[in-house]
């Protein structure tokens, strides 16, 4: 505090007296409440800054505590939007099921209830918006979309606080909670090297290569610049025959002793070209839950679900609605899991 500056805390009521409006109006304007006009919100925020107003963090914490303890219906529900053509398919993936479980448990812990809404011919985005608005559901969670994207039309995102899981949800460009895929790639490579593997290859699909591949390539560079195996990208345009052909050619040319992949059917693909796991080649995956191998990364999916709920509740508490100008990404580090598809290499110390 500058010498001569008053030590008295500036309050909401002080700002209200200066502007000749009610303290309720000032409070709402400072919270970006859309019931207050943009011009007045801007004026209140400008004057409050000039007067040296700072929110009392203890009062804010008390307010959030009271809101969490209240049995009133306001803010009592959060929406989980399932857009999959076959709705049960979403949670058939163990990763995504744990997203739901973590989110559901965290919502209950915080005094909310998480409800699933399935989009279909009857539950259109327009109808969904009316239901959410009528029930005062202010928070939306968007789980992974798979291969399809939703045509949201004129959905009014500015009325809702929204968080998406991962990068398959392209629209809306809301805040994101997901696994730290670059870190997971590096964790995987380092642990494969720890187990004695020296010729570690990466096999991926185009949409996943950049995310997981960066950590893998950095790990490869750190380990030994003289051993470089280019990642094999199995493009969507390949038919089954082409996939097996390019896989076999890559294996013959680079002779990896272990493979890191995000393709769940990789073990079966290797078997079909005559490579047994783990006898001929070790195998690790980016998801030990859905990846088709028991060695690799546990993405801590339940924690991702919890974090998504914490983020959306924070947005509600701060009245931050709509598609943000600056998107925040909350990344959860995975952990390595040893497994039988990637046994320790005998005599690795000599390698």
Q: Where are the model-predicted features located?
A:
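Charged, helix-prone or intrinsically disordered regulatory segments positioned adjacent to compact structured domains
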Residues: 67-76, 80
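Bacterial carbohydrate/catabolite-sensing allosteric modules
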Residues: 1-4, 14-18, 49-51, 56-57, ...
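Extracytoplasmic/periplasmic substrate-binding proteins
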Residues: 92
């Amino acid at each position: 505090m500058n010498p001569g500056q008053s030590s008295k805390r500036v309050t909401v009521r002080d700002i209200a007296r200066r502007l000749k409006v009610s303290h309720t109006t000032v409070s709402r304007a400072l919270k970006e409440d859309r019931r207050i006009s943009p011009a007045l919100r801007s004026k209140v925020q400008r004057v409050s800054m000039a007067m040296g107003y700072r929110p009392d963090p203890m009062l804010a914490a008390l307010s959030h505590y009271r809101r969490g303890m209240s049995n009133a219906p306001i803010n009592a529900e959060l929406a989980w939007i399932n857009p999959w053509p076959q709705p049960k398919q979403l949670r058939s993936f163990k990763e995504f099921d744990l997203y739901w479980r973590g989110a559901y448990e965290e919502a209950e812990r915080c005094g909310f209830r998480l409800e699933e809404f399935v989009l279909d011919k009857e539950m259109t985005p327009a109808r969904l918006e009316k239901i959410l608005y009528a029930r005062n559901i202010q928070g939306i969670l968007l789980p992974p979309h798979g291969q399809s994207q939703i045509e949201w039309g004129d959905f009014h995102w500015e009325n809702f606080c929204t968080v998406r899981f991962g990068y398959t949800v392209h629209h809306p460009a809301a805040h994101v909670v997901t696994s730290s895929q670059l870190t997971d790639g590096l964790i995987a490579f380092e642990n494969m090297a720890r187990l004695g593997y020296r010729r570690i290859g990466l096999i991926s699909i185009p949409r996943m290569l950049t995310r997981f591949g960066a950590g893998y390539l950095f790990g490869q560079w750190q380990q030994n610049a003289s051993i470089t195996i280019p990642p094999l990208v199995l493009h969507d345009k390949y038919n089954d025959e082409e996939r097996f052909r390019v896989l076999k050619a890559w294996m013959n040319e680079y002779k990896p002793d272990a493979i890191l992949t995000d393709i769940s059917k990789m073990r079966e693909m290797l078997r079909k070209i005559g490579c047994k796991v783990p006898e001929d080649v070790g195998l690790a995956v980016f998801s030990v839950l859905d990846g088709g191998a028991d060695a690799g990364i546990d993405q801590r999916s339940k924690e991702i679900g919890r974090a998504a709920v914490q983020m959306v509740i924070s947005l509600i508490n701060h009245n931050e609605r709509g598609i943000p100008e600056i998107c925040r990404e909350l990344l959860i580090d995975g952990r390595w899991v040893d497994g039988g598809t990637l046994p320790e290499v005998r005599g690795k110390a000599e390698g």
